[in-house]
C-alpha cells in the first residue's frame, strides 16, 4: 500500500491532461449499509475496516481512485445515527460536515431491506445541501428474489421525488460498480490531480494498523465491547528481519478488559494473530505485534481523550 507523506509527495503530483476530471465524493448513509465495503471495492484494496457492528467507521477516511481520465477522492464517513455519547456526537457531526464540503454526495442504502427511519433522517439532511446527490442501491445480491422489484421501486420513487439519479450494485461482489464509477466521474468537473496517481489513501500507515486491530476486536468480541474500544499505536520499530508494532487497546471498564484478554489470554492472542496477519498484508512484510490492554473510564465522553485518539473534535 502507498502511504502518504504530504510534504514529500507534493512534488510528485503531475499536471492533469486536458479534459481530466477530479473532485471529492462523500459516501453517506445510516450505519451498516456497506459504505466501507464500497470504498474498498472502488479503490481496489482494503483501506477501510468492515464488520457487522454498527458505527464501525469512526474517522473520515479518504480513498483515492486515479484513472487516466480522472481522480475521485472518496470520503468514507461514519454512519449517521442518533448519538448517545460525545464520541457519537463527534462522529455524526463529522459525517454531516462532509455532506457540505464535497463536490458530490453518494447516499448509500441497503436495498435488501425496506426504507427505514434512519434512511429518511439522512434524506432530510441531504435536502439541506445545494450540491448534487446520487443514490446507490447497495446489496442487490442480498435482495429476496420475490421482493426485488418492490424494494427497488420504493427507493426509486423516493429518489425521483428529489431528482437524485439511482444506481444498483453490490459493493460485496462488485457487480454494477464499473458503471457506477463511470457515473461518478461524469458528474465531476474538470480539475487537477489532488494526490499523486499511485496513492490510495490520505491516512498514514499507523492509522491503518490501529484500524486493523480494532476490526478484529469488532469481529471477535461481544456486542458490548466494540463501541468502548480505542486503539493507539505506541511504537513501530523497523528491523532488517521484521517490523515490531506495539499497540494499546483502551476500554472503559475492567469487565471489558477481561473480555478482551479472555481466559488465560486466549482472546487477546486470537485478536493479535488475526490483526498481525492483516498488518503483514498491509506492509508486505513480517510483523511482530505486541498488544496490551488498559482501562480509561468514560473516555468516549472526554473531548481531550477523543483528541488524543485522533478524532476530529471541533467546538
Curated annotation (Swiss-Prot):
Keywords: Cell inner membrane, Cell membrane, Cytoplasm, GTP-binding, Membrane, Nucleotide-binding, Ribosome biogenesis, RNA-binding, rRNA-binding. Residues 169-171 are annotated as: G5. SUPFAM superfamilies: P-loop containing nucleoside triphosphate hydrolases, Prokaryotic type KH domain (KH-domain type II). One of its GO terms (molecular function) is small ribosomal subunit rRNA binding. Residues 29-36 are annotated as: G1. Residues 138-141 are annotated as: G4. It is found in: Cytoplasm; Cell inner membrane. GTP binds at residues 29-36, 76-80, 138-141. Coiled coil: none annotated. One of its GO terms (biological process) is ribosomal small subunit assembly. Residues 21-190 form the Era-type G domain. PROSITE patterns: G_ERA, KH_TYPE_2. Residues 55-59 are annotated as: G2. Residues 76-79 are annotated as: G3. Residues 221-297 form the KH type-2 domain. It is a peripheral membrane protein. Monomer. PANTHER family: GTPASE ERA, GTPASE ERA, MITOCHONDRIAL. An essential GTPase that binds both GDP and GTP, with rapid nucleotide exchange. Plays a role in 16S rRNA processing and 30S ribosomal subunit biogenesis and possibly also in cell cycle regulation and energy metabolism. HAMAP family: GTPase_Era (MF_00367). This is GTPase Era. It comes from Synechocystis sp. (strain ATCC 27184 / PCC 6803 / Kazusa).
Amino acid at each position: 500500500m502507498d502511504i502518504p507523506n504530504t510534504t514529500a509527495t507534493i512534488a510528485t503530483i503531475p499536471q492533469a491532461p486536458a479534459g481530466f476530471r477530479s473532485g471529492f465524493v462523500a459516501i453517506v448513509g445510516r450505519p451498516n449499509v456497506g459504505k466501507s465495503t464500497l470504498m474498498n471495492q472502488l479503490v481496489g484494496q482494503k483501506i477501510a475496516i468492515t464488520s457487522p457492528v454498527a458505527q464501525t467507521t469512526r474517522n473520515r477516511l479518504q480513498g483515492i481512485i486515479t484513472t487516466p481520465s480522472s481522480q475521485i477522492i472518496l470520503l468514507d464517513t461514519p454512519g449517521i445515527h442518533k448519538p448517545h455519547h460525545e464520541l457519537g456526537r463527534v462522529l455524526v457531526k463529522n459525517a454531516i460536515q462532509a455532506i457540505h464540503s464535497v463536490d458530490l454526495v453518494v447516499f448509500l442504502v441497503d436495498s435488501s431491506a425496506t426504507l427505514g427511519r434512519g434512511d429518511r433522517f439522512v434524506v432530510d439532511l441531504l435536502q439541506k445541501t445545494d450540491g448534487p446527490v446520487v443514490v446507490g442501491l447497495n446489496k442487490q445480491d442480498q435482495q429476496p428474489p420475490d421482493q426485488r422489484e418492490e424494494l427497488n421501486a420504493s427507493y426509486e420513487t423516493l429518489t425521483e421525488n428529489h431528482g437524485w439519479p439511482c444506481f444498483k450494485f453490490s459493493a460485496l461482489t462488485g457487480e454494477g460498480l464499473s458503471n457506477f464509477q463511470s457515473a461518478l466521474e461524469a458528474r465531476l468537473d474538470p480539475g487537477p490531480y489532488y494526490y499523486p496517481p499511485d496513492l490510495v489513501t490520505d491516512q498514514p500507515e499507523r492509522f491503518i494498523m490501529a484500524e486493523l486491530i480494532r476490526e478484529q476486536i469488532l469481529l471477535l468480541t461481544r456486542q458490548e465491547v466494540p463501541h468502548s474500544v480505542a486503539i493507539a499505536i505506541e511504537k513501530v520499530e523497523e528491523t532488517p528481519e521484521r517490523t515490531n508494532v506495539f499497540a494499546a487497546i483502551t476500554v472503559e471498564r475492567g469487565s471489558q478488559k477481561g473480555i478482551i484478554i479472555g481466559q488465560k489470554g486466549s482472546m487477546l492472542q486470537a485478536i493479535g494473530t488475526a490483526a498481525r496477519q492483516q498488518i503483514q498484508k498491509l506492509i508486505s512484510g513480517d510483523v511482530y505485534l505486541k498488544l496490551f490492554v488498559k482501562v480509561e473510564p468514560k473516555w468516549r465522553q472526554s473531548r481531550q481523550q477523543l483528541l488524543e485518539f485522533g478524532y476530529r473534535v471541533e467546538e
